[in-house]
C-alpha cells in the first residue's frame, strides 16, 4: 500500500509535470469540467490532458505585507484582501487556472503558544481549525472556484524532517483530512483537490495502513 507521502508525490507529478497538455484558462463563472487522473496527467471528461497554471495564497498576516493589511484574526479584512488579490490577478489577464490554498496555522494554533517553525504542531487547536475552516478557508476556496480557478487545499504548516505511518504528525494529518474531506461543502467537490502533506522530506520505512474511503 502507498503511504501518504507517495500519494503526495504522485499528485505533484500529475500537477506539475504535465507535458503536451491542453491549456485551460479561467474566467468568472466559467464552466469547469471535472478532472481525473490518468497516469501522470490530469484529464477532462473528453480525454484532454489539462495543464494547470496557478499561484499560492497563505492566510497569515505576516506573509501578506508583514501584517499591514490585517491582524488580530480579523476574518473580514483577511477575506477582503485575499479575494482582492485574486481579482487583481484575473483582471491583469494572467493565464491562471488554479489556486494552491494553504490552511495557514496562524488560524489553527492557540494564540500565545511558542512554536519552533511550521512543522511544530504542539499549538494546534482542532476546534480553532474547524472554526476557521468554515470562516476563512472554505470561503476563499469557494471564491476562487467562482472565478474559474481549481483549488488545491494544503494542510496547516509543513512536514517535520521525518514522517512515518502512525506517528504523531501522520495522526495529525489524518485528523485534519478526515474532517476536511467529510465537510459537506468540500466532500466530492468537483473543483477542489487536497494536497495531503506539504514539504515532506524523509519517510521512515513502515507498513502502511489501509487507505481510507471518505
Residue map of PLM features:
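Cysteine-centered motifs
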Residues: 16-17
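N-terminal signal peptide c-region/cleavage motif recognized by signal peptidases
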Residues: 20-21
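Bacterial N-terminal signal peptides that target proteins for export
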Residues: 1-12
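Active-site mouth of glycoside hydrolases
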Residues: 29-214
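Boundary at the C-terminal end of the N-terminal hydrophobic targeting segment
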Residues: 24-26
Amino acid at each position: 500500500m502507498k503511504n501518504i507521502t507517495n500519494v503526495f508525490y504522485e499528485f505533484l507529478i500529475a500537477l506539475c509535470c504535465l507535458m503536451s497538455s491542453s491549456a485551460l484558462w479561467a474566467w468568472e463563472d466559467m464552466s469547469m469540467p471535472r478532472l481525473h487522473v490518468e497516469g501522470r496527467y490530469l484529464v477532462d471528461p473528453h480525454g484532454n490532458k489539462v495543464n494547470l497554471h496557478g499561484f499560492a495564497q497563505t492566510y497569515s498576516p505576516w506573509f501578506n505585507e508583514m501584517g499591514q493589511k490585517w491582524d488580530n484574526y480579523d476574518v473580514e479584512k483577511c477575506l477582503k484582501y485575499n479575494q482582492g488579490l485574486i481579482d487583481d490577478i484575473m483582471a491583469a489577464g494572467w493565464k491562471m487556472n488554479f489556486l494552491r490554498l494553504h490552511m495557514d496555522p496562524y488560524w489553527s494554533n492557540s494564540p500565545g503558544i511558542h512554536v519552533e517553525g511550521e512543522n511544530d504542531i504542539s499549538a494546534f487547536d482542532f476546534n480553532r481549525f474547524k472554526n476557521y475552516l468554515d470562516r476563512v478557508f472554505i470561503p476563499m476556496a469557494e471564491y476562487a472556484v467562482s472565478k474559474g480557478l481549481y483549488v488545491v487545499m494544503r494542510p496547516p504548516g509543513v512536514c517535520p524532517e521525518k514522517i512515518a505511518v502512525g506517528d504523531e504528525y501522520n495522526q495529525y494529518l489524518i485528523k485534519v483530512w478526515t474532517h476536511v474531506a467529510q465537510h459537506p461543502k468540500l466532500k466530492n467537490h468537483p473543483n477542489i483537490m487536497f494536497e495531503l502533506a506539504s514539504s515532506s522530506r524523509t519517510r521512515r520505512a513502515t507498513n502502511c495502513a489501509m487507505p481510507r474511503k471518505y
